[in-house]
Design a protein with these regions (language model features):
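Short coil-to-beta microelement around the adenine-binding A-loop and adjacent beta1/P-loop entry
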Residues: 14-16
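ABC ATPase nucleotide-binding domains
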Residues: 30, 71-232
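The feature captures the beta-strand-to-loop junction immediately N-terminal to the Walker
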Residues: 34-36
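Helix-to-loop junction immediately C-terminal to a conserved catalytic motif
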Residues: 49
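Conserved ABC transporter NBD signature motif
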Residues: 57-65
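Non-catalytic connector elements of ABC transporters
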Residues: 247-370
């Protein structure tokens, strides 16, 4: 288990990169550190690797304090964004290099290098130089080199940033499969939320040097703790609708741009104590039902445009100052929505029990306050 407690990192000039990071990572887990540029994810990884000395806090591996240990004493393998291969060495020598440093016999280190190359399906490339390989092949070599010494912890620092979309999916699948087979405790740094959700068992979302939420992809997507997490997870991003909680004829309602609509039954109890509170309704494109503008309980919106994505339509519509995206599964309605968009006609949406509700001032998820 890796245990990080109160990790702080301050650079010259008073810049705080990490402001109290706390994490527990179980043996065999695959963790993603996710967030925008400058949030502290790579700094956290480099502290774990021993490439940076934190200002304060501790890092433990299996109860052993490794905070101030040299990188070579941590039994860690690391895969970098730039591959960091030796251009003058053959692939097999690049892979075997960590074993050579450990003074492993030549026959054994080549044997282990070949076996690792076979796992990543690059055994036919062993006699080539890095310059003769594609980006995806070079990344596989870098992964082999990191894993050949059988590390206890495997770190990935944005390993797919230099790859095109198709290669990203390929390498993503390779990483996921390899980690599942070896069960090496692994941590990946990425700014791509789809990448993190596809690979990781749990994801830590960072912003301004702090962990905003550390949970499974499902929980982060369905139950974000605040507006930052809600906006960061999902493509398209979560929609936000400004509202106020009011008492209506049938019970608790949202007041949206002068319209009074009922709060979905499954959310009414949790919001009962929030009367007159200014909130933002958080709803994903597929978590609302498109209906006619005059439907009972619907929010009326003005249609701005429609995109045909093949498997669905993505309708953009506006209510007040909020532009939202609505998923429409019936692609035969493209002409209908296109017609509405041309004249800025109205449609309606019905909110479902899947909505989240955030306090407009604190940005916290009101549904998680209990």
């Amino acid at each position: 288990m890796i245990k990080i407690e109160n990790l702080r990192m301050e650079f010259e000039g008073g810049v705080t990169a990490l402001d109290g990071i706390n994490m527990e990572i179980q043996d065999g887990e695959f963790i993603a550190l996710l967030g925008p540029s400058g949030c502290g994810k790579s700094t956290t990884l480099n502290c774990i690797a021993g490439l940076l000395d934190p200002t304060d806090g501790t890092i433990r591996s299996d109860e052993v304090d490794i905070t101030n240990k040299a990188p070579k004493e941590r039994n860690i393998g690391m895969v970098f964004q730039s591959y960091a291969l030796y251009p003058h060495l053959r692939v097999i020598d690049n892979i075997a290099f960590p074993l050579k440093q450990k003074k492993v016999a030549k026959e054994e280190r080549y044997d282990r290098a070949r076996k690792m190359a076979a796992k990543l399906q690059i055994e036919h490339l062993l006699d080539r130089k890095p310059t003769q390989l594609s980006g995806g092949q070079q990344q596989r070599v870098a992964m082999c080199r990191a894993m050949v010494k059988e590390p206890k912890i495997l770190l990935f620092d944005e390993p797919m940033s230099n790859l095109d979309a198709r290669l990203k999916i390929e390498i993503r699948e390779v990483i996921k499969k390899l980690q599942a087979e070896t069960r090496i405790t692994s941590i990946i740094v990425t700014h791509d939320q789809e990448e993190a959700m596809a690979i990781a068992d749990r994801i830590a979302i960072l912003d301004n040097g702090r962990i905003q939420q550390f949970d499974t992809p499902f929980e982060l997507y369905q139950h974000p703790v605040n507006l930052f997490v809600a906006n960061f997870m999902g493509n398209p991003p979560m929609n936000f609708i400004d509202a106020r909680l009011v008492k209506g004829e049938g019970g608790l309602c949202f007041l949206v741009d002068g319209q009074t609509v009922p709060v979905p039954p499954a959310r009414a109890k949790a919001l009962a104590g929030s009367l007159d509170r200014e909130v933002k309704i958080g709803v994903r494109s597929h978590q609302m039902r498109p209906v006619e503008a005059g439907a009972v309980g619907a929010i009326r919106l003005k249609v701005q445009m429609v995109e045909n994505l093949g498997k669905e339509l993505l309708v953009q519509a506006q209510v007040g100052k909020n532009l939202i995206r609505i998923s429409e599964e019936d692609t035969t309605k493209y002409a209908f929505y296109r017609g509405l968009a041309d004249v800025k006609g109205e449609m309606g949406i019905l909110l479902t029990d899947q909505i989240n509700v955030f306090d407009s001032e604190t940005k916290a998820n009101v549904l998680m306050e209990q």
